Amino acid sequence: LSEFHLDDNFLLARKTQALGLRAKLIQSIRQFFIQHNFLEVETPIRIPAPAPEEHIEAIPSDNWFLQTSPELCMKRLLAAGFPRIFQISKCFRAAERGSKHLPEFTMLEWYVAQFDYHQLIGQCEAMLIAAFKAMGHTQNITWQNKKINLASPWERITVAEAFSRYAPITISEALQQDKFDEILVEYIEPRLGIDRPTFIYDYPAKLAALAKLKDSNANVAERFELYIGGLELANGFSELTDVHEQRQRFEEAQEARAAKNWARYPMPTKFLNSLQTMPPCAGIALGIDRLAMILANTVTIDDVVAFPPEAL
């Protein structure tokens, strides 16, 4: 017999409630999208070229890669005339492990043609309110002793407002000193979504690898994130549809990666070519495991997956 321990069964048995809750959550999310006439799609998990991004490292699989997100293939479907699509899939990112991170995790992504990021914020809120309601939370939810009011409308603040409200320096100073992420994590994130969920939007242009810039202000991208109880749950944006600008951003990301001695990815040319027929659209990625953490009232992502990597 292999190294079998009763402890393994005991640890799994302790997760009965959390895994049941997780299954019900995924079913309620799927139900929302079916009711709203979305097509559920499946795209390959193993791909020849991920989107080059400065802070995300893909896991190699032979001479291809495991997807860090289904984004590129889903956008190719949008460009081919599929206007409302969603997918719940496994994604993989190298060197991501912690109480809130897994190297293999479950992501919900959806895209809507002729939507902008503000419309998508509204739809994200409606979807989550419906999912929480299906799970028995109509008024509020408690996570780590924080009582979070789920009543609509949820809080919406710009990144610049969040900096002026919570940070010791302005957003301009943070960008000049290359401290944006540091200040966001230390001072701002812990204050977001505390009494009610918070959408923080209008990110600096340099932090928007695949997002459209605002027509009225090219220093700002039409990007948003959702926080509940200080935990980042989702990231969405109005999609960039300009093929030349997207190629240039990918090249800049490749250079930033090279400076860190990270791999240079093949350019995802089929995705870039598809942008020529891409309608105006918006898309979002939401972490299912983190959402399950909130519903299970736990601070450890391991509690809501059957087998974290160390249990294999």
Q: PLM features: what roles do these ranges have?
A:
Residues 133-172:
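Alpha-helical scaffold segments that mediate packing/assembly in large oligomeric complexes
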Residues 121-131:
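Short amphipathic C-terminal alpha-helix that caps PH/PH-like domains
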Residues 28, 44-77, 84-119, 157-312:
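A translation/RNA-centric and nucleic-acid-associated enzymatic feature enriched
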Residues 35-41, 133-142, 294:
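Surface-exposed helix-capping loop/turn segments at secondary-structure junctions
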Residues 81-83, 137:
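Glycine-centered helix-coil hinge/cap
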Residues 1-59, 286:
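TRNA-binding/sensing appendages of the translation machinery
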Residues 35, 79, 130, 134, ...:
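Residues at alpha-helix termini
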Residues 15-24, 112-118, 142-158:
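Cytochrome P450
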